[in-house]
Amino acid sequence: MTQDVEMKEVPAPAPSNSVTAATPSTLQHLKEIASLIESGAYAREVRRILRAVRLTIALRKKLNASVVNAFLNFSLVPGSEVHARLASYLPKEDEHDMEVDTAMSATTTLAKHSLPELEIYCYLLVLIFLIDQKKYSEAKACSSASIARVKNLNRRTVEVLASRLYFYYSLSYELTGDLAEIRGNLLALHRIATLRHDELGQETLLNLLLRNYLHYNLYDQAEKLRSKAPRFEAHSNQQFCRYLFYLGKIRTIQLEYTDAKESXLQAARKAPVAALGFRVQCNKWAVIVRLLLGEIPERTVFMQKGMEKALRPYFXLTNAVRIGDLELFRXVADKFASTFTADRTHNLIVRLRHNVIRTGLRNISISYSRISLVDVARKLRLDSPNPVADAESIVSKAIRDGAIDATIDHANGWMVSKETGDIYSTNEPQAAFNSRIAFCLNMHNEAVRALRFPANSHKDKESAEKRRERQQQEQELAKHIAEEDDDEF
């Protein structure tokens, strides 16, 4: 980001009206978005509202107080209750900006319609601007007022805008540390969305509730809500990715590592390329889960573009687990303790200590056909008061779980390893190929389900028999008309 700033050229001094020249372009875009929302509301076309929201997100970096205020004057009736409320959240402008807004409002006027969609869009625009300007107290007040207004509206075209309002409503309270205050309100909104069959709203609110619970480590409540909430086909890819990520976190805490790994990897794979921060979080949890499963992630996972720095602590952790060095594992855990605490993965890393010991024991079992338990304790660097007894207990448990193929000679205090057999004579290669084939088939099915088809296309298709009958009738009719013409002639 710093590099981009340095590469920019210094603009030449512009005349005094250059400030006003940049403002109408942004305002003009907002006016086009307003007309798009208006046409979508009249035609009841939800796709146009979705497109308007996407265009707004692209414009958010260009917003300023004068542009937002001018758009409010353009789309709402000046002096109305909604206009006065939204204008009160915006910062006061200087006289120059006020003159610019007045001039633009005078040149182009909109026939003011009491469209609920346009009113909700104004709430959304002001809320986005306040959050970007870090005016969180005003954003909380604006979001609360917008939610109170949305509760009284039951229109399909409003649901798209309402889902975005729900997100920023939760975000504004999260940024001020008051996320617990709105949990009851989010549950009430989810109930209203369910009664109105608003599937997009249900999807968004379920994710916000899961995020709310997980923020306070209420994993049991989150799982109860998730299991009882209605599920249906995803309407938003972003919301589906968030759901998979939260599901992966819940499954990880519940020790269901296989399901957690699948959810976290699927969320990272489905996430948009621009959502780098989200994909980084998904990869962090996926790495931890794979380590807990006894797998070692590939080096390419940590070398993904834009993720090298964020995943460096987890790379060093993976290296310690791969080697089975307990001392190196402790050093990495202590060095990056603040990072792991911020990522909320510190408790999971504590669980990895057992995996490190088991990996080291497996390496010892492969390297030595017979080794004393004293040497095993020394190589594992066990720091307990009675390391030999602990080593014997660890080896016994590993043999029972099938992690190593060995026996214990209690009389002499040895661990005797058995010869390793041919892995290709077992079912492991078949299971590995089966998992890869299932993964490819699932990806193909998801890609097919994600395709868009024209509405009622199956009704427009004409069977071959009907086509032949129609053509035959047309030929007979043409022949009959020709015969009548001959008779008249």
From Swiss-Prot:
Gene3D superfamilies: 1.25.40.570. One of its GO terms (biological process) is ubiquitin-dependent protein catabolic process. Keywords: Nucleus, Proteasome. Residues 457-482 have a biased composition (Basic and acidic residues). The keyword Nucleus applies. It is found in: Nucleus. Pfam families: PCI (PF01399), Rpn3_C (PF08375). Residues 241-422 form the PCI domain. One of its GO terms (molecular function) is enzyme regulator activity. Transmembrane segments: none annotated. GO terms for cellular component: nucleus; proteasome regulatory particle, lid subcomplex. InterPro entries: 26S_Psome_reg_C, CSN3, PCI_dom, WH_DNA-bd_sf. Residues 1-23, 454-489 are annotated as: Disordered. Acts as a regulatory subunit of the 26 proteasome which is involved in the ATP-dependent degradation of ubiquitinated proteins. Belongs to the proteasome subunit S3 family. The 26S proteasome is composed of a core protease, known as the 20S proteasome, capped at one or both ends by the 19S regulatory complex (RC). The RC is composed of at least 18 different subunits in two subcomplexes, the base and the lid, which form the portions proximal and distal to the 20S proteolytic core, respectively. This is Probable 26S proteasome non-ATPase regulatory subunit 3. It comes from Daucus carota.
